[in-house]
Amino acid sequence: MSGQTEQGKGQPLSFRRYKDGDHAPGAWQQEIFDADHSHKCPTYIQSTPPCQGSCPAGEDIRGYLNIVRGIEKPPAGTTWQEYAFRRLTDANPFPSVMGRVCPAPCESGCNRNQVEDTVGINSVEHCLGDYGIANKIAYPKPAATTGKRVAVIGAGPAGLACAYQLAKMGHEVTIFDDHAELGGMMRYGIPGFRTPRAILDAEIQRILDLGIKTHLNCRIGTDITMDEINASFHAVFLGMGAQSGRPLPVPGATAPNVVTATSFLRAFNDGRMRHVGKRVVVVGGQTVSGATIGYDTSILTLDLP
C-alpha cells in the first residue's frame, strides 16, 4: 500500500506495530482510550469474555469450551471430558446440579447471540457434570496441609463450595448445619424432579472426600455457641443463605393457608407436608412457582404482572 506525500512522491504506508530491531510490542491501551481511530491497527487486548463475565460462579467457560471443541488438547492419558471437567470444577464443584437448575446468565451474554443463537453452555456443564459422576472422578487432595482450622456454618451451596475451596488449599474444614442432611436449599428448596437426589449426593460426597468433617443437626446458639467455635477455629465462614420467602404486599397475604413458595417447598422436602388442598393458587410464573406446581397436578396458576 502506498500514499502520496505533499511533494507528490509515493511512499509506502505501514501499519506495523514493530520497528526494525524491536523485539517487544508497545503498549497501545492508552492510545485506544485516547483516540477512536486506533482500532484500525491490529491490536489485541486481553479481556473477560461476556459469557464468563456473566457467570456468578466465576467458571472458566471459555477454557472448558475450548477443550470440548478440541482447540486445547488434554495431556496424555487424560480424556478431553475429564480435562474439561477439571477445568470447570476449579471454580464450581456442582456442575451436574448447576447444569440442571442454573438460569444460565452466561448464555444471555454469549457473543453468538449477535450471530445466530447462544452456545448451549448450560448443556455442556450438565454433560460434563454427569460424566464426572458416571466415571467417579475424584478431586485431588492437597499435597500438604496448612494446619489452619476453618468452621463453615451452613451446608448449602455457598458453605459447601467454600469448604471445597478451603480444603483444596490444605485447610482443615468442619461444616455445621442444623439439618439432618447436607445441601441446604439445593435439597430442601429445589424439588427432586429438578435435582435428582442421587446426583446431589454424589457431588456432595465428592467434596467430603477431601477430608471435610461435618456436624449435622447442630444449631448454632443452641447446640454450640459462637464463642466455642471462635475458640476452636482460626476462621469462620457464615453461609446460612437466604431461605426466607417474601410475602406479597397485598391485603390477605398473612391469611391462614397463605404461604410463600420457599416455605411450601421446605415443608414438602422436609416431609412435614403430607396433604395439599384440592385447589391451590400459585401467584407467579417463574422457576420457584414451577417447582411448586410440580408437586400437585390440580393447581390453578395466577400470573400477575
PLM region descriptions:
Residues 1-149, 197, 236-254, 273:
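Ferredoxin-type iron-sulfur electron-transfer modules and their immediate structural context
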Residues 82-92, 124, 186-234:
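N-terminal Rossmann-like dinucleotide/flavin-binding domain of flavoprotein oxidoreductases
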Residues 171-187:
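Glycine-rich FAD pyrophosphate-binding loop
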Residues 152-176, 216-230, 244-246, 263-305:
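Rossmann-like dinucleotide/flavin-binding elements
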Residues 238-239, 260, 282:
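Redox-cofactor binding/interface segments in oxidoreductases and associated redox assembly factors
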Residues 249-266:
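A short, gly/pro- and small-residue-rich
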